[in-house]
Swiss-Prot record:
Co-factor note (free text): Binds 1 heme b (iron(II)-protoporphyrin IX) group per subunit.
Native source species: Arabidopsis thaliana (Mouse-ear cress)
Taxonomic superkingdom: Eukaryota
Protein name, as recorded: L-ascorbate peroxidase 2, cytosolic
Gene: APX2
UniProt entry keywords in alphabetical sequence: Calcium, Cytoplasm, Heme, Hydrogen peroxide, Iron, Metal-binding, Oxidoreductase, Peroxidase, Potassium
Residues at which heme b binds: H163
Upregulating conditions: By excess light treatment, by wounding and by heat-shock stress.
Length: 251
């Protein structure tokens, strides 16, 4: 694990985080938008490059230039949904706000409570396109993309389990359908579904199947399908790492 030294934030800022969290719970519950909010948080963070220290969860995804990246099709909807709440909390950085929203999206759908440390600063320059995972690719691609972020095999499989939420939309990704029978509940059903083979009406992407094709990925899939607590524990660690890529790292 990368050692962290979190910045001191003022009491007023901490209180704003807590109030914002309550407002986000209300919005995400009312609009059933946890899946797209989680996707926004992930795609915001997943552009980090551990070598060049560029990209990452620093709020640049709000810019039209980054929203126009192919991997971010449809995420303008999430930005627009969240904007009225962000306007209530001008003190918060977009960087913190989007990662806080991702934490709430997991928690409010029955998933684990992920620790949240405030203090990310907004950056201006969006990262180059092409740093996010592509659904049509296989094992090597997953390791390349997540390795560039500084994440490992366990993180890859645990984060893949986030596909328990939501669905694919043909006009956004070229694929259609949900991964699990209940796409608004965060649980370990993603792993059960991919192990049980393709089913009518449910989706399996090439990147999902890749988890079964690899001797290092497969044991994690089997473990998480059998033990939801183990999945939640590893997911929490992986989500926290993703949400803090390039943030508060000790030199």
């Amino acid at each position: 694990m990368v050692k962290k030294s979190y910045p001191e934030v003022k009491e007023e800022y901490k209180k704003a985080v807590q109030r914002c969290k309550r407002k986000l719970r209300g919005l995400i519950a009312e609009k059933h938008c946890a899946p797209i909010v989680l996707r926004l948080a992930w795609h915001s963070a997943g552009t980090f490059d551990v070598k060049t220290k560029t990209g990452g969860p620093f709020g640049t995804i709000r810019h039209p230039q980054e929203l126009a990246h192919d991997a971010n099709n449809g995420l303008d909807i999430a930005v627009r949904l969240l904007d009225p709440i962000k306007e209530l909390f001008p003190i918060l950085s977009y960087a913190d706000f989007y990662q806080l929203a991702g934490v709430v999206a997991v928690e409010i759908t029955g998933g684990p409570e992920i620790p949240f440390h405030p203090g990310r600063l907004d950056k201006v320059e969006p990262p180059p396109e092409g740093r996010l995972p592509q659904a049509t690719k296989g094992v090597d691609h997953l390791r390349d993309v997540f390795g560039r972020m500084g994440l490992n095999d366990k993180d890859i499989v645990a984060l893949s389990g986030g596909h328990t939420l939501g669905r694919c939309h043909k006009e956004r990704s070229g694929f259609e359908g949900a991964w699990t029978p209940n796409p608004l509940i965060f649980d370990n059903s993603y792993f059960k579904e991919i192990l049980s083979g393709e089913k009518e009406g449910l989706l399996q992407l090439p990147t999902d199947k890749a988890l079964l094709d690899d001797p290092l990925f497969l044991p994690f899939v089997e473990k998480y399908a059998a033990d939801e607590d183990a999945f939640f524990e590893d997911y929490t660690e992986a989500h926290l790492k993703l949400s803090e890529l390039g943030f508060a790292d000790k030199e």
